[in-house]
Amino acid sequence: MSRSRAWPSFVAALVVLALGALVAVGVGQALGLSYEPADTPPAAVSAVDLDPLVPAPAIATIDVPAGEQVALAASAVSDALTTRGLPAPTVGVGTGDADLTVSLVPPFTDSAEAYRVRTAGRLVLEASETAGAAAGLYALADRIRSGAALPADGAAVEPRLGLRLVDSGSVGREADPAAFATGTDYSLNTDVVAGAVLPEAPWVDQDVVDEIDAQFRQLVQHALRHGYNGVVVPGFLEYVTFSGVGDGHEVYPEGDPHVARAEAMVEAFGPVFAYAQDMGMHVYLLTDMLAVSPPLEAYLERTVGGLDVDDPALWSVYQAGLSELFESMPFVDGLMVRVGEGGAVYQAGWDFSSRLAVTSQSSVQAMLNALLETASAHDREIIFRTWTVGVGAVGDLHTNPKSYEAVLGGIDDPHLIVSTKYTMGDFYSHLPLNPTLETGSHRRIVEFQARREFEGFGALPNDLVADEAQALQQFLAANPHVEGVWNWTQDGGPLRAGPMTLYLRTGFWQMYDLNTYGTARLAWDPDLEPSQVTGDWVRQTLSSDPATSTEITEALARSREAITRGLYIQPFAEQTVKALGLEPPPMMWIFEWDIVTGDSAALDSIYEVSRDGLDVAIADGAGAAEVSAGMREQVASTSPDTWHSPELYRSFVDALDYETDLLGTLAAYRETVLRHAEWLDTGSATAHDQWRAAEQDYRAARAAHVERYSGDLDLPAYLFTAADLGSDRADRDPAMAWAARGLLLAVVVVLVLGFTSARLPGAAALRALVVAATRPWRLGDVPAPTTRADRVLVWALPAVVLVLSRCVYTWFAAPAHLVATLGAWLVLAGVLRWVVRGRDPFHLWAALGGVVLLRTVILLVALVVRGPGRYWFGFWTDPAARTAYITVAFAAFCWLFVVVALVLRRAYGLGTTRSLGATLVAGGTALAVVAGGVAVIGLERALTIWNDQMALLPWGLSRILGITVHLGIPPSSAGVLAVVGIVVAAVGVALALAGRRAPDLTVAATRL
């Protein structure tokens, strides 16, 4: 009889184990930590051997052709001469003999920017077009400022890359100390003109427009002097009325303020941006797609049925808007489009946003074909950015040549330019060069970032000239279609989470102006010696003293070593890693920008990848700090009197002090987390002692760093909140391991006592719990006790074990996890108690308590090794252990419902159908309540609270785009689960009612 009653339970056990195995495999595939060596290029090295300073040419008079463009370029020569201590020359038009004469001659190359300088006798600069005359004057000014020799006599000079773009710099951005002081504003909007927008007529604040105009002119003039010939300005929908759609009022009805505002914007900002074209620069507007406004979205809903980005009818609306833009702003050379990120600009009178909708191969092609048709009709260009960053089916378009060819290979249009970041990912170090830039037949431009967002936001010395030279040389050798660069002087990353440096305007912006200068010089001639380019910039920006400029240039030559060793854990950084279905960046331990992470997912994975080179990885941190200290000593040894200003000297030395302090702090933290992970992995006493010693160093260094730099707008302290959360939990691992051992021993003692016939108070309760945990099909045979001690102990003991074990599991630091876990148990128990209302609940409590003890034993076995830290270390890094644990743990979770159904049937006689129904009601209600609570709170907020307390995933996820966005979790998931719970409960109610109306088949068969 006993065997016949047991075999269904054995079958159920096999089924739940199989389910557990399936879940374990699915989790393993979702996590999928894998890595392989990345094709990281060797470190670019450029020996410092600067050319000697050359005396500035004696130029007292300059004769130039008529025109503002050339006159502005001539003023650059004048300023260069005065910088070298010479009198400002007289600039005239058609004055005849002059010390420097600019002449327009017949073409001698294919480039409109070509020029040549004749140095026999008086200087003569020859060019075939105004663009060449201006380019030649800017180049002469640069040579004079740098103390460099002039071009060879009569040699034609033309740019290797004909399109050299900059972003809009800091134009339109406010140096707001209060906004920057918080250091936690991770908003990514880069709009230029929003500060001038008014909520009502006249729609724009002319005083703000004038300020933006002055800032834009400053940017244009500086960029021209560096050698750029184009600028990219955010904007599209704010200048469009869609007057070309239907009768002109279909998108924006008559009287809609969008129309008057757009017209006012064109009138106000058209002349501002046209200045760039007047001075010889290309002007491109930049937009995300799909760009929308509420009326536009409503119109598309009415006419196209929504945001159907494959429908030509949708794109015809944008074609009309683009055509209007080209007509109302004729100086605009084209539109730059990005589809991989989106967002909104929300403020008074401003309601434009974008949707991540163009995510398939067909939709990208439909968009480009439509926009190119309009651009071709107006002889303009479309620049398509391949920055798709994992979005949709085109998520790897940015880095995968096969995807690039599949999406773009069929588009052949001379008006299309494809723009791509130079690295195989974002602007990090240690990444391979982007292979898609070596393929394809389209016109290509290469994107660079001067103010490296992930490497201190430009606050740290970071000479990228040699790296960029290496990249350009490789791309040009492989792809003849590379024809330009786009340098980000200010853009990239959050606007106000780093130092308050605004390009050309606020803070020590000169630190990253080096890279802006270097990119332009290399775009003209990629074969230049990088250290000489850096030296030229140093001489004209910081110091022209030969000894001082050499010391500074040599220090900058070491800057990449300090950055690449100090901000990266090299064994990890030089691997191509995949985890959680994503490709983590090479700087996961700082996630992102200035957030030093403390989560186990990142840190344990970094250790796993770096395990074989652990000592080197740790030594790199201290080595980087030593390099920075050496740079500081080298620069500080120069005399401030030899610099162009003492303020520049002080700013540079302060930056090196900051870097040395930061890298030293990070070095101590690096050793702390890696040695902790080593201890979790091996249990080594040596690793434990090294972890503890490093942690003491880290806490002292961190406190000093925060005290010194907290509130410093120029050199802000890094954010260690996440690191502290992780360190606090790591510190508790040894104690939690001992607590788990003690609790496990107590549970084992309880189980042993339950197996014996010992006559102790509560013995009946212990026997019932043991039977429920090991042979639940026999629980109905256990007699109900007669003592109050047994009736209390049968539920109180499992409750205490449940609470204590989950407290240990969460380091006594995650009440959110306890609320969710204990809440689910309470709801389940409450519903089941209602089901057996009017009856003795002893067997029900025994059933639930037995499963609690069983599941707790499984959990504690995983915790006794080295606490929750080791539990999660195995989860992230050990596929075999993870699979085994999840299989058993999930099976035990499912086993709960098997046991509940058994006890309802065997102990309370509910019958098969009613027992199943009641079990579904209890389980569904618990799911609905917990998931519903999460939905009410908000899934993103709930996950943030939980993750902040558990420190499992990067703390920065929720501070930037959100955990749900990063991991692709639909925000409605909690609500959907709540509905599922309600449906399950409803099915359970139906089954329970059906079971009451009809005799159970098994019982009926027994009666026959």
Which role fits each region the language model picked out?
Residues 2-16:
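N-terminal Sec-pathway targeting helices
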Residues 20-123, 128-131, 148-155:
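Acidic, contiguous N-terminal accessory segments
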Residues 38, 180-187, 484, 489-728:
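C-terminal non-catalytic alpha-helical accessory regions
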Residues 46, 73-76, 80, 109-111, ...:
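Feature activates predominantly on carbohydrate-active enzymes
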Residues 82, 169, 229, 259, ...:
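Catalytic-core regions of glycoside hydrolase
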Residues 736-758, 979-986:
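Selective detector of the "anchor" transmembrane alpha-helix that sits immediately C-terminal
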Residues 762-843, 848-852:
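Selected alpha-helical membrane-embedding segments in polytopic membrane proteins
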Residues 829-946, 954-975, 992:
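Hydrophobic alpha-helical transmembrane segments and adjacent short intramembrane/lumenal linkers
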